[in-house]
Regions:
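Active-site-proximal alpha-helix that buttresses catalytic centers in soluble enzyme cores
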Residues: 4-150, 156-159, 167, 183-185, ...
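Generic beta-sheet signal
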Residues: 78-79, 170-178
Length: 230
């Protein structure tokens, strides 16, 4: 056997046969396998790094997020989208008074949400709501007042961000009682992955730089109790 030759003799006694496997024939594929394996690891990592970051949860000890929300609210820089509370036609719970509206048990949730916004301050806030019953009822129990209803808070697949900015008054926060589709439309407009928001969730958008609004984060209805504002 020549020097340096890496042959492995595999002798098979079965039927008296002897076979030889030359490992050199596999060496040519080794580099290709290494490159392929590396690519399989690198490509998903690259896609993950380049994908838009998820919208931050402002609750559960997110001190920096809570501080940014409080500061932005005090300056009248915020747009907040509030999803209506539990809708009756998608629930087995008792309706408040209209099947197209909210459930009876959701009334307390809306009142509680309103109290949270009262703590933030409503003197420098403007309120708009979708004209659908579930949104008007939510707004009514949150703020003891209801707007006439704006169609752009229902049909929100196009120009939703532009419409929101057009209704935002400098130095005043804008509260929009709307629907999950509109919240997702806002995320899409700001190039963020869409989220599945629960009933009564609030999505906050900072307009500190009016030409470059950014999603600050969200708070689910049940998570306000964990919020700590500086």
């Amino acid at each position: 056997m020549p020097s340096g030759r890496l042959d492995v003799e595999l002798r098979l006694s079965l039927f008296g046969l002897t076979r030889s496997i030359d490992t050199r024939r596999f060496a040519r594929y080794r580099n290709a396998v290494v490159v392929l394996a590396s690519a399989l690891l690198v490509i998903p990592l690259t896609l993950w790094l380049l994908s838009p970051a998820a919208v931050p949860d402002l609750a559960h000890g997110n001190i920096a997020g809570a501080r940014a929300l409080a500061d932005g609210w005090a300056k009248g820089e915020m747009i907040v989208l509030v999803r209506h509370v539990e809708r009756c036609d998608h629930s087995k719970a008792a309706c408040l008074n209209d099947r197209e509206g909210i459930t009876d048990r959701a009334r307390a949730v809306a009142v509680g949400l309103g109290a949270r916004f009262e703590q933030l301050g409503l003197d420098n806030a403007d309120l708009y709501n979708s004209p659908l019953v579930r949104a008007t009822q939510t707004a009514g129990y949150m703020f003891n007042k209801v707007g006439s209803g704006d169609d752009w808070l229902i049909n929100c697949r196009h120009d939703f961000l532009r419409n929101a900015l057009a209704h935002k008054v400098a130095g005043r926060n804008l509260i929009l009682v709307t629907h999950s589709e509109c919240m997702q439309a806002m995320e899409t407009a700001l190039q963020r992955p869409t989220s599945a928001f629960g009933y009564g969730a609030s999505l906050f958008v900072s307009t500190a730089q009016p030409q470059a609004p950014r999603l600050l984060g969200f708070i689910e209805a049940s998570d306000w109790r964990s919020m700590t504002f500086p």
